């Protein structure tokens, strides 16, 4: 099942200046029936991508914000379970929400690197379509000179699948609150249904600035600066890896 949406708007506020705004939202889902396994369990999974904006959230400052946001998000996640009567599931009544769990790390990552308020960021790895932010392409032409600028940024969940042992804590079919059993210790771990190994934000200015000109002798001249950045949150290793690249052409 695919739920993909693309939107684009082009405006020309002044002659020669074209501004293109575009947004994408891709929610691809799959369902697998394991008919060769006892009980024929169903595995759900898929991939996800949406346009966003991550400008100004760079380096150490953004990472420190990510670390701080974990505590705020963990408190909010715990609050979702706190109002439920879970003594028959968890011996202590409420589960312990760890700051390095996927349910905490992913919203903290999104809020830190897209500049969102951690008190209002959705507690999900799949942000709502209403949180889409546009990317843009700007072109300005005057006489024989053309200036170009383009910004593309996407938040992505490359691939995920459901936990086979996941069980819900409520009868509400719209709720993702539940738990799995740790295969090593046997302890119950509060979690949403999906095992998400990694999420990322890919950002590029392609170009940051480009100047194209046709000289009087019909020779084309072009100067271009590209900037790209990749942010990857690996859940298993609890690492955020940031890489960047600058190209001058």
Model-derived segments and their meaning:
Residues 1-249:
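Exposed, low-structure sequence patches enriched in small/polar residues
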């Amino acid at each position: 099942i695919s739920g993909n949406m693309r939107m684009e708007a082009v405006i020309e506020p002044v002659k020669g200046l074209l501004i293109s705004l575009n947004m994408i939202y891709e929610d691809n889902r799959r369902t697998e029936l394991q008919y060769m396994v006892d009980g024929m369990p169903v595995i759900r999974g898929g991939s996800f991508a949406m346009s966003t904006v991550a400008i100004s959230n760079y380096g150490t400052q953004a990472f420190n914000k990510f670390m701080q946001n974990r505590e705020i998000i963990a408190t909010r996640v715990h609050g979702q379970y706190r109002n439920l009567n879970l003594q028959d599931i968890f011996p202590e009544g409420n589960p312990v929400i760890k700051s390095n769990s996927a349910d905490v790390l992913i919203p903290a990552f999104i809020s830190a690197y897209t500049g969102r308020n951690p008190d209002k960021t959705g507690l999900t790895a799949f942000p709502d379509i209403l949180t889409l932010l546009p990317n843009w392409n700007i072109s300005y032409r005057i006489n024989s000179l053309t200036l170009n600028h383009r910004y593309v940024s996407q938040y992505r969940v490359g691939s995920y699948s459901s936990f086979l042992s996941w069980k819900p804590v409520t009868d509400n079919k719209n709720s993702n609150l539940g738990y799995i059993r740790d295969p090593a210790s046997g302890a119950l771990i509060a979690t949403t249904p999906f095992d998400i190994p990694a999420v990322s934000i890919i950002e590029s200015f392609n170009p940051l600035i480009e100047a194209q000109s046709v000289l009087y002798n019909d020779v084309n001249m072009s100067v271009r600066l590209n900037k790209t950045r990749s942010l990857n949150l690996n859940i298993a290793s609890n690492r955020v890896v940031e890489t960047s690249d600058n190209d001058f052409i």
